[in-house]
Amino acid sequence: MNNQSNTNSIILVVEDINETRDGIEKLLKADGYRVTLARDEKDAIESAQREPPNLILVSVAGLPHEVVIAARHIRELAALGENVPVVVFCIAEIDEGDEVAIGQNVYITRPDNFNQLRTLLARLLQEIPIAA
């Protein structure tokens, strides 16, 4: 992964388990991304308003449809716009290794490993329209 191209991308990681959140942060920072962290929906909205992310990565407990609603809520209340991709980690409902697009720039994924997630994030960040 080219760290230089990632240095301007901010990824907001929403994860309720400290160890998992810290692990995701380390992996993303090693790839050169700037990372902001949140424990829950409220924390994520505040963080996104302070420093708008280029992508939101949500991995919190709950049924997949509930987590997707929360992720969209974060994007809406932080006034980020639909061009900010939302990626929801899902441990159920879809087959391992799959990625499902649901709605405008919202994806559910259950990666087999970090390399699959890394590839998805890089692709989505490259697809973001550049503001004029």
What is the predicted role of each segment?
Residues V68-I69, V88-T119, R123:
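Alpha4 helix (beta4-alpha4-beta5 surface) of REC/receiver domains from two-component response regulators
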Residues V58-R75:
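Conserved phosphotransfer microenvironments
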